[in-house]
Amino acid sequence: MNGKSHMIGVLLALGVLVASTAVVQAPVLANSNTYEYYVEGNAEDVTKPTQPGLVLMGGSTDVDSAFLWMIERSGGGDFVVIRAAGTEAYNPWIYYDLGGVDSAETIIILKPEGAQDPFVIDKIRNAEALFIAGGNQWDYARLWKGTLVEEAIQYVTAKGAPVGGTSAGLAVLGEFSFTAEKGTIVSKNALKNPYQPRVALENDFLHLPYLGSVITDSHFVARDRMGRLVTFLARIVNDGWAGQARGIGINERTALVVDGAGIATLHGEGPVYFLQTPGLPEVCEKSTPLTYRDLAVYRLSEPGAQFDLAEWSSDEGTAYTLSAEEGVLSSTQAGGGIY
């Protein structure tokens, strides 16, 4: 074979190789009627040593330092984002802007069948970091509860890899969650009637470390959600789901990163609020304004401030008590301010 013929043969062989590689990696932009999959970086699985952790993010602009913390704990492995709607916009940001990962992958689970798909489940289970994007938490409860996706999320936590969520993704991380099944609810309406249909709560979805007996809420100060969080807590204890319940309210552009010992550190702008119930509410009935006195509140405001979730205590920040009296909130702070 002369040189020219040899070169043509090599080029043809390379063409076949490229074509076969493209076929093998078709799921890189998988598009079915049950899920969509997108990736930046290496689509093949790698295994990296990880460290456990949680990222609880309050919505709006993401907190870069919290994602970098997750990436560090991922060991530079595969960073997987799951959601029920939206786009793959996290992928280029994580892979190119933040860097330090083998891949950034987004799985959009469109239907319950997608939450049982072996490809989807393998991608989640093999993640070195897993993040639940914002959206509508009812989609997550409706599509994922009782499925292999729920089991896969628990598996990632159990193997000691970091797991996080923002906004709706934050809402489903606690033992208890506000599902928004009937739509959202504002504080004044929740306080006015704790048993109205929009106060839709769930107690049997995810079970993550240090979030037992906890319900979370996001966009906290920006959307005035203290009243509804107090109402959620009242319902949880009044309905017998827990003898004592705890709430974590996280403001926008703010995150808590939680290490393997349960120490939560504030990243971003703050503040974050930690609430704890004192017992049963005085009045928590259908079509009757809530009366619930003396909930313990702890506020962290400064980046780097810490709270021990295992002991539910801190040497930093501000402590006060909060009460609902016939649907109206007040506190022991100067002027009675609830935040």
Predicted regions and their residues:
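Catalytic-core regions built around general acid/base machinery
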Residues: K123, G146-G160
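C-terminal and late-domain segments of enzyme folds
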Residues: P27-G76, G86, Y90, L98, ...
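Bacterial N-terminal signal peptides that target proteins for export
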Residues: M1-L11
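Glycine/threonine-rich flexible loop motifs
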Residues: Q137-T147
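Structural motif
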Residues: L56, A129-A133
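Portal/gating segments that form or line small-molecule/metal binding sites
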Residues: G86-N126
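Bacterial N-terminal signal peptides
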Residues: V10-T21
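Catalytic nucleophile loop
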Residues: A133-G134, V156-S177
